[in-house]
Amino acid sequence: AQGGLDNVSLRQINNAAGQRNSSAAHYHFGSKEALIKAIHEYRGGRINERRHTRLARLSTQEREQVRPLIEALVYPIVAEIEETEGGGNFIMFLSQLYSNPALDLMSMWRSHLSESVGAVYQQLRGVLPEIPEEVAGMRFGLMWVAMINTLADRQRLMVTRPGETAVARALPVLFVSNLIDMLCGAAAAPLSA
């Protein structure tokens, strides 16, 4: 994740994994794209599960508010970053996936994350019926990419410039709360046109 998806070979991945067999990753996955899909599936499945659990725990009142729904979008990914080995690398990896036109991202998205993210979106649509469907869809897509890239940028800064920027110095709770505030504002902003 740190050097970029396009700049790493399966041989380098084997070496980083401590594999003496230089073709182990190719043997197990067949290609770099298949390895990328496997990583996405592994991490995405856990995030999906966390998000479904969080949504199921929302009260009726919370299901009618923007913030608890946005929290259900954000916190499962934050948990993956903070609570799992390699979670910080995963968010940087995910950010790179979204900017790589060579990958079939939509098939990965549909199979591993879209179910729980779609549930959040549908509940937000119920809370914000005044936002037209087309606008709501665009906003949600922009919010998703902004969330992924913001979390990835913070992780990069924490690795490359710890303590040097306000983002890297911010306590995780403050940073995530601020991100959620921004996403809530984006979701519920009145139409200007």
Question: What is each residue range found by the language model?
Answer:
Residues 54, 58, 101, 154-161:
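Secondary-structure edge/capping motif, primarily at the C-terminal ends of alpha-helices
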